[in-house]
Amino acid sequence: MEVAAVSATSRPLSPLLSTAPARRLRLLPPRCVFGRRLRASPRTRASVEPATQELGTAGAGEWSGDAIRRRFLEFYAARGHKILPSSSLVPDDPTVLLTIAGMLQFKPIFLGKEPRRVPCATTSQKCIRTNDIENVGRTARHQTFFEMLGNFSFGDYFKKEATAWAWELATKEYGLPAERLWISVFEDDNEAFDIWHNEVGVPKERIKRMGAEDNFWTSGATGPCGPCSEIYYDFYPERGSSDADLGDDSRFIEFYNLVFMQYNKKDDGSLEPLKQKNIDTGMGLERMARILQKVPNNYETDLIFPIIEKAASMAMVSYAKTDDATKTNLKIIGDHMRAVVYLVSDGVIPSNIGRGYVVRRLIRRVVRMGRLIGIRGDGHGNSEGAFLPSLAEVVISLSTEIDPDVESRRRSILGELQREELRFVQTLERGEKLLDELLDGAVLSAGNNGDKPSLSGKDLFLLYDTYGFPVEITAEIASERGVTVDIEGFDIEMENQRKQSQAAHNVVKLSVGNETEIIKSIPDTVFLGYDSLSASAVVRGLLVNGNPVNEVSEGSEVEILLDRTPFYAESGGQVGDNGFLYVNGGEDRSQAAVIEINDVQKSLGNIFVHKGTIKQGSVEVGKEVDACVDAKLRQGAKAHHTATHLLQSALKSVVGSETSQAGSLVAFDRLRFDFNFHRPVSEGELTRIELLVNQWISNAAHLETKVMALQDAKNAGAIAMFGEKYGEQVRVVEVPGVSLELCGGTHVSNTAEIRGFKIISEQGIASGIRRIEAVAGDAFIDYVCARDNYMRRLCSSLKVKAEDVNGRVETILEELRATRNEVSSLRSKIAVLKAASLASKATTVEPQNVRIVVENMGDVDADGLKSAAEYLIGTLQDPAAVILGSSPGDGKVSLVAAFSPAVVKMGLQAGKFVGGIAKLCGGGGGGKPNFAQAGGRKPENLPDALEKARAEIVAGVSSSS
């Protein structure tokens, strides 16, 4: 529903009844700066909710969660606010991992980095918060997934209107008794206090002044900030108003927070009034549902309880009659299932890093809680099945008004959850067994030493890295057994692992990321590159190492800001254009200053930053330049970008429509396409995909591009990238009958320009994510020609025709295998011959008369060493023990231990024995009690290792008497 914007001064304020309230839900950690946790006030400590608490009769009645959400949005739409959709849980903000508040999508507007598109807006925003995960299910109000209802003003209305409307919404729309509402205000915000008391009519005794830690919002050390005011609901007004503590969770719940952004905090800490005053509010939908539905906690609202009921039925327990511990586990399941469904729907795939780790941790927590309450298999009799999909079905059925796109992604969501659950169950039992052993060992060790039982960081890392146990789950289980965990030691182990792979994840930021004043003062760049590869432009700014300068001379690297440009700036996976800027010096371009452009990036929304080197002359701010894009490279990017669209359509056609894009790279000479899929794409499927793409190329279809409303594009079936930020008007690129995508990139005008398409590789890059690399256009021709040359040379070397290469290679490989087998057999015979001379040198150890051979056999390989040991153990009479070592070359060490049955009965085991010796040689190994092999990388240590082996076996045999 769209409502025309009305100025704040023209809006009539509704009559206000006397009584109290106002504040935003503390769904962020206490006092947050865009998700950065600040020190918590003592009053925010969560109280544990008794599982048997009853505050009212459950049931949504008139006030279903959907009705509460709808009423909020319609209330503000009627007051001039534009209803905007929830943004993705994957934010377009590198400073936060997940969307944690309703204001996050408007952060650039609040910080003055982007112009406002509407004067005021209202949203219901999906949010994820995991910092208080240990309180989920144990208190009445903590959740990982929640919806934040919000109304926002971007310089339109301010404190008076925001306060009046919040009160009207709470008391008139939702019908909350005014006498049950309390207000908190910033201690120095007399204006807000006066509005609440004198205009709204809240009694002074129900307005509490709070300190800056609780009621003053900041965006960082400097920048926009302001006081906030919060509305609380009082569950027990009969307790009176004297000495009432709004931090008492058993009595009060904060459900609405109003942030008044009216100051700019300067470097010296002083506050100056903002020219544009903003409003940022947030109401917790689940909290309001708890109040209106008269249930004892957020979990028993109609937003979550259907999931709990489903889990209870699968566990064959009654929620109403079960014990408190089971209720807590059911609440955790209900909460976490909402989080994982919406995260997976927004394209977050379980993994061991970043957002993927968040969803994996939540999934595995649900699986563990399900097992604790008795759910086995799929919960419907199939012990080999998964139960998460059944719970996810309930979440999806509740999602219609939260996120309409979830239903269309049902198949991929259910498939991903099933795979992740079964994957975890496969390792869970092994991991649980090891964890039990580690916990038993910790308790036993502590008992012997008188210390408190604890698991080391190495133990935690082993469970995490090998068995997939999130450290938080290990800590939970350990806590249940009274065992502490060494989180600091675990962090050290994790850091060591990160250092090994850090290079692969480094991100290089442009120096303009410092957001210098020059960038902020320059208007958006006009992009001309869809229609032209050259244009005249004016230099609006120059940056060297991020600092503004007026002139740059030959040899310097520079970042150039133009008023308009034909250069495409990197976005949507497509790399930025290359080319040249010529400082206008008349008709003779040879006399002009020349800047070679090797990259173009966007800054602060839509300012194009041209990165390059001054090759000749100098350039000054204000000068006119001729901007010329490298046409050949641009054509390569266009061919690969259109080919990427065709590839995505072919993938969906061949392997299933549930595949979705997870990322892409469109370069001048190649393309890379990452997609969500649970298995490798077969050779046959890859061939079919190639054929489809090349067929569409040969159809010579003309592409169509148009700009339309975002919702119209979605209704037409246009594919949108998960997490991508789109405006109200979007550019749609269509290959008729084949592909329809939202895309701002450059494309060929006709598919025939692509010339051809070839897949180079297909591989997995993370759990549930596959990658295809391919070439198109001139790169395709180059690739085919290179492969043809390779084939010619191969045919010449093998002296066969191309069609006979495969057969000839197989013959050569078979001959090679036979030759290697012959060589190995000969080496084994030689080793046995050497061993024959060793049998007579065996040492006899009393009192068991054990025959022992410990010998260095030179360069004998591992197979020969094994044959020699088998020969000796068969030749020597039982009891006998043989330990052989060798250095076969390439810095390798081979070790073998063979013990006869009588020696094994003495308690000596070859597997354990050889592993310990191998460590001296920089390796390891093991095997059975009677026979084991090992290896190493330090041949220089072999003599000492064998001497130690001799001493230990003699000692072991001697002591066995």
Swiss-Prot record:
Catalyzes the attachment of alanine to tRNA(Ala) in a two-step reaction: alanine is first activated by ATP to form Ala-AMP and then transferred to the acceptor end of tRNA(Ala). Also edits incorrectly charged tRNA(Ala) via its editing domain. Binds 1 zinc ion per subunit. It holds the Pfam family DHHA1. It comes from Sorghum bicolor (Sorghum). It is an enzyme of class 6 (ligase). It catalyses: tRNA(Ala) + L-alanine + ATP = L-alanyl-tRNA(Ala) + AMP + diphosphate. SUPFAM superfamilies: Class II aaRS and biotin synthetases, Putative anticodon-binding domain of alanyl-tRNA synthetase (AlaRS), ThrRS/AlaRS common domain, Translation proteins. Its cofactor is Zn(2+). This is Alanine--tRNA ligase, chloroplastic/mitochondrial. PANTHER family: ALANINE--TRNA LIGASE, CYTOPLASMIC, ALANYL-TRNA SYNTHETASE. Consists of three domains; the N-terminal catalytic domain, the editing domain and the C-terminal C-Ala domain. The editing domain removes incorrectly charged amino acids, while the C-Ala domain, along with tRNA(Ala), serves as a bridge to cooperatively bring together the editing and aminoacylation centers thus stimulating deacylation of misacylated tRNAs. GO terms for cellular component: chloroplast; cytosol; mitochondrion. Belongs to the class-II aminoacyl-tRNA synthetase family. GO terms for biological process: alanyl-tRNA aminoacylation. Its EC number is 6.1.1.7. Keywords: Aminoacyl-tRNA synthetase, ATP-binding, Chloroplast, Ligase, Metal-binding, Mitochondrion, Nucleotide-binding, Plastid, Protein biosynthesis, RNA-binding, Transit peptide, tRNA-binding, Zinc. The lineage of its organism: Eukaryota, Viridiplantae, Streptophyta, Embryophyta, Tracheophyta. Zn(2+) binds at H641, H645, C743, H747. Monomer. Coiled coil: none annotated. It is found in: Plastid, Chloroplast; Mitochondrion.
